[in-house]
A protein has these predicted regions:
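Conserved P-loop NTPase nucleotide-binding/switch module
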Residues: 1-79
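NTP-binding/hydrolysis catalytic cores, primarily Walker-type P-loop NTPases
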Residues: 64-131
């Protein structure tokens, strides 16, 4: 999967189970370490960092419904670890009278590296990020 993502062609997607965007990245690193390829950890991290742009976390909330709870961007390496920057998050605000989780989506004051690339592809983002 990571080999395919690193070929230079845009548009890969995959899923895995984890507890957070950071854990998802750690799990990818661990899966590569479990492979028979004998690569040093820093090479594996570099490989993962180049392959992944965005991590979208979906959680099952207290009412049993699934919701996107975090969108984070891979922003490079920091202290020999893959660094993530959260772009959006869902913040729970309690339960409605019907027992549904209430909350709001928070947009952080961070313009992702992918912003210009998405704009060139015709995705209108000004309503979210401003100009």
């Amino acid at each position: 999967m990571l080999q395919a993502m690193n070929t230079g062609h845009e548009g890969s997607i995959t899923t895995l189970h984890s507890t957070s965007p950071e854990d998802a990245i750690n799990r990818l690193e661990t899966m590569m370490l479990m492979n028979d390829m004998e690569l040093p950890v820093n090479a594996i991290r570099n490989y993962v960092e180049k392959a992944i742009d965005i991590v979208i976390q979906i959680d099952r909330l207290g009412d049993g419904k699934r919701k996107i709870t975090s969108i984070s961007e891979v922003v490079g390496m920091k202290n020999d670890k893959i660094a993530l920057k959260e772009i959006f998050a869902f913040k729970e605000k309690g339960l409605s009278d019907q027992g549904n989780v209430r909350g709001e989506f928070v947009v952080y004051k961070y313009i992702p590296k992918l912003y210009d690339r998405m704009k060139r592809k015709g995705i209108i983002l000004e309503d979210i990020f401003g100009e």
